[in-house]
Amino acid sequence: MSFSRALLWARLPAGRQAGHRAAICSALRPHFGPFPGVLGQVSVLATASSSASGGSKIPNTSLFVPLTVKPQGPSADGDVGAELTRPLDKNEVKKVLDKFYKRKEIQKLGADYGLDARLFHQAFISFRNYIMQSHSLDVDIHIVLNDICFGAAHADDLFPFFLRHAKQIFPVLDCKDDLRKISDLRIPPNWYPDARAMQRKIIFHSGPTNSGKTYHAIQKYFSAKSGVYCGPLKLLAHEIFEKSNAAGVPCDLVTGEERVTVQPNGKQASHVSCTVEMCSVTTPYEVAVIDEIQMIRDPARGWAWTRALLGLCAEEVHLCGEPAAIDLVMELMYTTGEEVEVRDYKRLTPISVLDHALESLDNLRPGDCIVCFSKNDIYSVSRQIEIRGLESAVIYGSLPPGTKLAQAKKFNDPNDPCKILVATDAIGMGLNLSIRRIIFYSLIKPSINEKGERELEPITTSQALQIAGRAGRFSSRFKEGEVTTMNHEDLSLLKEILKRPVDPIRAAGLHPTAEQIEMFAYHLPDATLSNLIDIFVDFSQVDGQYFVCNMDDFKFSAELIQHIPLSLRVRYVFCTAPINKKQPFVCSSLLQFARQYSRNEPLTFAWLRRYIKWPLLPPKNIKDLMDLEAVHDVLDLYLWLSYRFMDMFPDASLIRDLQKELDGIIQDGVHNITKLIKMSETHKLLNLEGFPSGSQSRLSGTLKSQARRTRGTKALGSKATEPPSPDAGELSLASRLVQQGLLTPDMLKQLEKEWMTQQTEHNKEKTESGTHPKGTRRKKKEPDSD
């Protein structure tokens, strides 16, 4: 039937018109495409629904962000649907749509197509708005709505149109099976065909710290024709790089921020020392060494060890680490058809847990290392040591590598008056330190769980062994190591922790690749990168030997730069840049770098100098020192990006020289850290008054087990506190929280404002009701209850 003939059919009276609707749809199909809304379609859809649902894993539909479908404006051809039938009565249409929404059969049918209650509701709201707000509708849906209004069709006939609209706003509904295939992570060994094409020999060097396990693996590395060392830290990669070249084995260095080739012609050496994330899984080697293999369980970085273990193309792969990783490694290698040879090592020097705690900083001896788990504890301990006329070195995680090495050298030098080290668990690996006695200032380490909540937990056995093992190392002048705690009540818990067996590692980390995310983006082109990651993790399938690593830092960066126009691959690279999201200046720098990149404006040396306001002054207080550390991290970020986008970050060598100069400024600041602490106290930038020579709040007695998983300020409710000293009479709970690093002064001010507001509201309620607020009554009763 021709188009003009179809129009003639549309002039028929309403009754005859409805009777011939199927014929009209058939006539118009060549002109307007298929009509999904013919009568009887619902039953057909119901029959096909079982195949449409696909897959057995129920997705988390809260991750599906609906797209916006704009209502249709006036058409240049006019309202063809109205010409074929008649204009629609919006009130009648609304009644039809409401009836459609309430139909249980329709809701059930929607569920068969992946529309749970939440998606169904969102899709209907969008569908209704589209229908009601459009100036003209497509011919097919206009005709169906007209017939329903006149009783010639059923409301169920709207379902095909509704489903089509739902797939427009939720495109994931149309490609769930494809997304499941892309995110199928159940056979990671198949991702590395080059490694699978060779028969590798896996040798596991198992033992505690200071057992010589890494030494034996490195000797094999030195004697090989070619090799790669994969370490967890830049410091370790640098150490092997220097040792290898000193031994006459030419070795290159590859880290995220640095590339060093030793051959005069720039040719790659046969050996390379790198951080584990930077190892090549396509270059063939004779020997590969993967250090600290137990970090394969790390929630954030475990994927890098998994990738190295499964993907390195080496005839021999030497693994160094804790015995807890042996079973998992053997299981993983069973899936690749490779056998594992285990070589056990014993500690080379004895280590003992003392029966007495330090109790007071007056009892410090040369070679002592006090391990703290917060910067505020480091500052306070350093200040107390300085008051006693002693000199201490300071090492914590956010210090630049050069500063850490300088402080380690100062502490190790027998001719230097510095005989005490105050450090965080950053000393657990990567530094050679001559420590006689490890003193745990606290056994409670703040951490962030998978929900982003702050937790206070005792350190694990693995962490305790790693830190305690730094005492009395074979290569140091102290051949016997000792371990104790600052407070006596912590000593029994430390002994208990050290005696516990280390839990075997159950699973290895995985991470989506850029290629997998790109394939996701192909199917979901309008989704944000953060949303793509959420959907990928939700759809991903892993077996019991693997887990998907925590992607929170990646998502944080993705959301930070979401509004910057970048290609997906470039955006992905920016999001993998290692930044400390607790540093506002570093985060804003990532944003600024991305913005400059999007404008195609190279980030030159001159531009960066202006951005960081170079030259920088030496620090006058702790805040200045922390600001300099943040600037150092920004320069690290520039160097990291310079190896990914050389044309846009062209001045890496100049920036590296600038960073070395900054490192020197920071070293001088840390060398005089007690002076900075004094200045901070003077200007009330750091409140350490009344701080006793022990920890402020400790787990003790039976409360220890109860407080192993506490959150926020609730942790203090499960702790027993020491009686305050006479000098600390004014020491409040808020002060203790600040000193322990659980609150910043700014956070405390905000809380004080909120408390004042709440108190004002309570007083107002009291005045209006004539009754005492509950909080006020309790406060009055407290003295009587003691």
Swiss-Prot record:
E.C. code: 3.6.4.13
Disulphide bridges: none
Boundaries of every Helicase C-terminal domain copy: 353-518
Named cofactor requirement(s): Mg(2+); Mn(2+)
Basic and acidic residues composition-biased segments: 749-771
Modified residues (N6-acetyllysine): 99, 220
Location of region: Interaction with LAMTOR5, important for protein stability: 650-786
Subcellular location: Nucleus; Mitochondrion matrix; Mitochondrion matrix, Mitochondrion nucleoid
Transit peptide limits: 1-22
SUPFAM superfamilies recorded: P-loop containing nucleoside triphosphate hydrolases
Catalytically driven reaction(s): ATP + H2O = ADP + phosphate + H(+)
Family: Belongs to the helicase family.
Quaternary assembly: Homodimer; in free form. Component of the mitochondrial degradosome (mtEXO) complex which is a heteropentamer containing 2 copies of SUPV3L1 and 3 copies of PNPT1. As part of mitochondrial degradosome complex, interacts with GRSF1 in a RNA-dependent manner; the interaction enhances the activity of the complex. Interacts with LAMTOR5/HBXIP, WRN and BLM.
Protein name: ATP-dependent RNA helicase SUPV3L1, mitochondrial
Gene behind this protein: SUPV3L1
